[in-house]
Amino acid sequence: MSVIRPTTVEVETSLRLVAPDATALPVRASLRYDPADPYAVHVLFHAESAGGEAVSWSFARELLVTGLDEPAGIGDVRVWPWATPRGDFVALALSSPDGNALFEVPRSVLVRFLRRTYVVVARGREAEHLDVDTAVNRLLAGR
């Protein structure tokens, strides 16, 4: 009998990078959820179109879930609801030693993405999909 592995969820979207003067630039991004890493979501910012390099961030799926309705996160990744005259968005603030970035993400995109991740791994059932040996090996390898 073969075992069917859950599939990875990937969504391509456009975000807005909000500059300190409140102007915004569009940035293509890929949202990714892999059931082999059930607690995390991965975002790849395709900054190469603006002359930079692609940048990848990973953080807790639950952080996005909470940030849809209330401020969430401390430190490097913060998420909060952001209503504008153009519609409902979610603010995604990223901080690193190299700098800070504030992105405006359409709330509807995140809701659809998260719903698709729940089909693959239900909320609260992440531990059932965690391969502890692989996770420990990744930690020891520094990945």
Swiss-Prot record:
Mention one GO biological process in which this protein takes part, according to its record.
Answer: sporulation resulting in formation of a cellular spore
> Which cystines does this chain contain?
none
Under the heading InterPro entries, the entry gives:
SsgB (IPR006776), SsgB_sf (IPR038658)
Q: Where are the transmembrane segments?
A: none
Q: Which family does the entry's similarity section mention? A: Belongs to the SsgA family.
Q: What does this protein do?
A: Involved in sporulation-specific cell division. Required for early stages of sporulation. Important in the process of growth cessation prior to sporulation-specific cell division. Recruits cell division protein FtsZ to the future septum sites and tethers the contractile ring structure (Z ring) to the cytoplasmic membrane during sporulation. Stimulates polymerization and filament length of FtsZ in vitro.
Q: How does it assemble?
A: Interacts with SsgA. Interacts with FtsZ (via N-terminus).
- Protein name from the UniProt record: Sporulation-specific cell division protein SsgB
The record lists the organism as: Salinispora tropica (strain ATCC BAA-916 / DSM 44818 / JCM 13857 / NBRC 105044 / CNB-440)
**Gene behind the chain:** ssgB
